[in-house]
Regions:
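Divalent metal-cofactor coordination and adjacent catalytic microenvironments
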Residues: 1-128
Length: 128
């Protein structure tokens, strides 16, 4: 997917496009490639549509943006001089919240859940 396709989708569909507009074309292109690469790893069974790639590309750009969207990024506290940021759930999710809402858990998360469920299985038997 190219940068212009994502740009057109943002122009037509998103009000909060500040992180995209602030980034230059080179960073926008890298964000799109990075989003596609990560999404292909996390959601191998899904076709990567423009909306999903766009949400993740914006999430990537917001992550390097010094003016983070604190609430959306689940930030709990910020310290300026020590340059520390703490998150409510321990760390910033690597998957954009909008992507997670659309596609659900990643393939790795599903595999972990299945492994945990397999460990909890109890097999019945008969005493003689």
């Amino acid at each position: 997917m190219d940068r212009q396709t994502v740009n057109d989708w943002i122009v037509d569909n998103m009000l909060d496009s500040e992180a995209w507009l602030r980034a230059g074309e080179q960073k926008q292109s890298v964000a799109v490639k990075q989003a596609e690469r990560k999404l292909a790893l996390w959601y191998p069974e899904y076709e990567l549509v423009v909306a999903v790639v766009t949400y993740q590309a914006l999430w990537e750009l917001q992550g390097v943006d010094p003016a983070l969207k604190y609430q959306k990024h689940n930030v709990k506290t910020v310290t300026d001089n020590g340059e520390s940021v703490s998150y409510k759930d321990g760390e910033r999710d690597v998957v954009a919240p909008d992507v997670r809402a659309l596609l659900g858990p990643t393939a790795d998360e599903l595999a972990e859940q299945e492994a945990e469920e397999a460990l909890r299985l109890q097999y019945g038997g008969a005493l003689i």
